[in-house]
């Protein structure tokens, strides 16, 4: 029997066997992120328009610009629903009886509200990045 095929088989199958025996990566636990914590996590992962750490502006001023950017992504209502008083820019309209079910459905599908109530993983937040 020729030893070369056995050697090649071990060389080719060795790494595959080693990888199959390696422990599976631990699944990331969802983290509850509400209000400005949610905004900051998004900025940390995605960045924002004209927003960078090198910018000389105060961080507090950047939140308003970020909220305007997120408003286009339909996340603003979820931030307001989280109850963070620092992020509420305008009074909310009074609830209407006819739109109650629509409001509940919109809140259930809102990513900001979902991250606040149930938690989000890093991968969940990356799906919200505009780029």
Curated annotation (Swiss-Prot):
Among SMART domains, the record links this protein to: IlGF
Q: Does the keyword Translocase apply?
A: no
InterPro entries attached here? INSL3/INSL4, Insulin-like, Insulin-like_sf, Insulin_CS
User: Looking at the keywords, is Signal present?
Assistant: yes
**Cysteine disulfide links:** 34-116, 46-129, 115-120
Q: Which UniProt keywords apply?
A: Cleavage on pair of basic residues, Disulfide bond, Hormone, Secreted, Signal
Show the GO cellular component annotation of the record. extracellular space
One annotated GO molecular function: protease binding
Per the annotation, which location comes first and is thus the protein's main one?
secreted
Leader sequence range is 1-26
Q: In which tissues is it expressed?
A: Expressed exclusively in prenatal and postnatal Leydig cells.
Q: Where found, per UniProt?
A: Secreted
Residue numbers covered by the propeptide annotation in the UniProt entry: 58-103
The record, for Gene3D superfamilies, names: Insulin-like
Q: Which domain of life is it from?
A: Eukaryota
Against PROSITE patterns, the record matches this protein to:
INSULIN
Q: Which proteins does it associate with, and in what oligomeric form?
A: Heterodimer of a B chain and an A chain linked by two disulfide bonds.
Give the UniProt family note. Answer: Belongs to the insulin family.
User: Which protein, by its recorded name, is this?
Assistant: Insulin-like 3
- Its gene name is INSL3
